[in-house]
Amino acid sequence: MRSFVLRARAAPTTSKALLEGVGNEAHTEILAHTMMNTMFVAQSHREDVVVHLVLESTKDYSRTITIRSNDITNIGGFHESTLIAAVARALDASVGMGKEQLREVEPGITVRTVSFERLVQELAEDHQLYMLDKKGEFVRDAEIGENPCFLLTDHIPMPKKSFNSLKRLGTEKISLGPKMLFASQCVVLIHNELDIREF
């Protein structure tokens, strides 16, 4: 199982603001692009992949939208507007939820009112966490453990205070090269590396 977490610090947690954020300062299109490249391949979708989108621009609780490739049925296509609409439906389903609650949105998609920190604590129990960092070990040379989970961010970098807590959870730093890439591009390179390894 391959897992990915996209920490979208600028992404709003209301569907209206999310949709308005496409192509604007919040850059919510990053969510759709990352979903597309995480879940889909030509004429099909990947098996055994989970992506967690953590939307943090909120007045109450972060929203973690989880998509499981083995369980999705008909998401309606893989173009940007369709995928953003799926995220918007999850946000609509989360209205009125209290802290750390879970709701199923549709087959393969759930929404939780849980923070990035809490999510990665849970994932660390049965996943090896990897954070992308230009100073990390080059992915071609890195040993990738079982149940890898790759941590990504939107255009706002990971807060420095998060590094220490991630280190305590055993997170390893890996690099995809000297250039800063979009999260959706990182996903493609990670999948390609693991595909080559037949992981």
Swiss-Prot record:
GO MF terms, alphabetically ordered: S-adenosylmethionine-dependent methyltransferase activity; tRNA methyltransferase activity
Keyword Isomerase: no
Compartments reported by the entry: Cytoplasm
Species of provenance: Vibrio parahaemolyticus serotype O3:K6 (strain RIMD 2210633)
Lineage of the organism: Bacteria, Pseudomonadati, Pseudomonadota, Gammaproteobacteria, Vibrionales
Cited NCBIfam families: PRK02135.1 (NF002560)
One of the GO biological process terms: tRNA methylation
Protein name per UniProt: Putative pseudouridine methyltransferase
Enzyme nomenclature, EC number: 2.1.1.-
Family statement drawn from the similarity comment of this UniProt entry: Belongs to the methyltransferase superfamily. TrmY family.
